[in-house]
């Protein structure tokens, strides 16, 4: 069997649709999806097998990165550092841009990275045929910069094989780097953490600011059930009250939603104990970011 394998950094501005694309390619719910900008905070490896037209069985290891942005907050700088490191380490890069975005995001990417990359135009199902053609034409002035320009829709599964075919074409022949049926090398506790964050954003994205997170205090993995003890962290007591809700209605909804998603991903029952704490300025404190894994992620090789 002819095989290829390689790491592919998935880059883009916040809300370009990176996590939606990966979940569609995996046919599973691993990457956090939210309409809230910068929902993805940590780099995640997602493994997609693909057989290309040349007969190669390719193992494409996507690096799902935080959205490219420039803000002075320590948390934002940690996230940007992860994205830049992924761009440098990967064999190939895919820049994902929404059909509704101007070209500034791509131009910023070009200023940061001069390495081989594919430009993918996402969310084409939300635009007219004329709008898509116009946007493709706008990007043509940079045709010498990218290997290929692929319009697609993750939500409608349009043109995804074309993207994978293009990626596989530019990977080097190699033995597979991970086991055949593995979708991610993430630990289950980290996936569960992201699911809780997603549920928080699902129900309270307009009420709860960007400075909220989840910490898994204890994770007990048994044959038939996973037991998860977690805390939602916000910065103000007023935010804590919103998350809990009157008579605990909000935290119950968040917990139930998260638990059902966790059971689907883990393929077993899940017991979830969910608490809420207020910790002032946690997103600006290095010690807090270390506990949550952001600075460790940023500094490790």
Curated annotation (Swiss-Prot):
Residues 4-173 form the Era-type G domain. Its main location: cytoplasm. It is found in: Cytoplasm; Cell inner membrane. The gene is era. It comes from the Bacteria. GTP binds at residues 12-19, 64-68, 122-125. The keyword Plastid does not apply. An essential GTPase that binds both GDP and GTP, with rapid nucleotide exchange. Plays a role in 16S rRNA processing and 30S ribosomal subunit biogenesis and possibly also in cell cycle regulation and energy metabolism. Belongs to the TRAFAC class TrmE-Era-EngA-EngB-Septin-like GTPase superfamily. Era GTPase family. InterPro entries: G_ERA_dom, GTP-bd, GTPase_Era-like, KH_dom-like_a/b, KH_dom_type_2, KH_sf_prok-type, P-loop_NTPase, Small_GTP-bd. GO terms for cellular component: cytosol; plasma membrane. Residues 12-19 are annotated as: G1. This is GTPase Era. Residues 64-67 are annotated as: G3. Residues 204-280 form the KH type-2 domain. It is a peripheral membrane protein. Keywords: Cell inner membrane, Cell membrane, Cytoplasm, GTP-binding, Membrane, Nucleotide-binding, Ribosome biogenesis, RNA-binding, rRNA-binding. Pfam families: KH_2, MMR_HSR1. Residues 122-125 are annotated as: G4. Monomer. GO terms for biological process: ribosomal small subunit assembly. It comes from Helicobacter pylori (strain J99 / ATCC 700824) (Campylobacter pylori J99). GO terms for molecular function: GTP binding; GTPase activity; ribosomal small subunit binding; small ribosomal subunit rRNA binding. Residues 152-154 are annotated as: G5. Residues 38-42 are annotated as: G2.
């Amino acid at each position: 069997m002819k095989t290829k394998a390689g790491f592919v950094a998935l880059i883009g501005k916040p809300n370009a649709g990176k996590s939606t694309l990966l979940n569609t390619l995996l046919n599973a719910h691993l990457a956090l999806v939210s309409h809230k900008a910068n929902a993805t905070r940590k780099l995640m490896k997602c493994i997609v097998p693909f057989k290309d037209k040349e007969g190669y069985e390719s193992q494409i290891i996507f690096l799902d990165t935080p959205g490219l942005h420039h803000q002075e907050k320590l948390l934002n700088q940690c996230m940007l550092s992860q994205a830049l490191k992924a761009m440098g380490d990967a064999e190939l890069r895919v820049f994902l841009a929404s059909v509704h975005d101007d070209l500034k995001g791509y131009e910023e990417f070009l200023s940061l990275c001069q390495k081989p990359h594919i430009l993918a135009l996402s969310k084409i199902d939300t635009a007219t045929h004329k709008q898509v053609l116009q946007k493709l034409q706008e990007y043509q002035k940079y045709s010498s910069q990218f290997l290929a320009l692929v319009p697609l829709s993750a939500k409608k599964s349009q043109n995804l094989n074309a993207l994978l075919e293009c990626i596989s074409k530019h990977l080097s022949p190699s033995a597979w780097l991970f086991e055949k049926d593995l979708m991610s090398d993430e630990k289950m506790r980290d996936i569960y953490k992201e699911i809780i964050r997603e549920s928080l954003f699902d129900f309270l994205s307009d009420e709860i600011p960007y400075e909220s997170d989840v910490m898994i205090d204890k994770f007990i993995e048994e044959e038939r059930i996973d037991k998860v003890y977690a805390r939602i962290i916000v910065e103000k007591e007023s935010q804590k009250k919103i998350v809990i809700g009157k008579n605990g209605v909000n935290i119950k909804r968040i917990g139930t939603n998260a638990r059902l998603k966790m059971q689907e991903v883990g393929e077993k029952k899940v017991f979830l104990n969910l608490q809420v704490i207020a910790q002032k300025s946690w997103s600006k404190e290095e010690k807090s970011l270390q506990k949550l894994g952001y600075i460790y992620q940023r500094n490790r090789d």
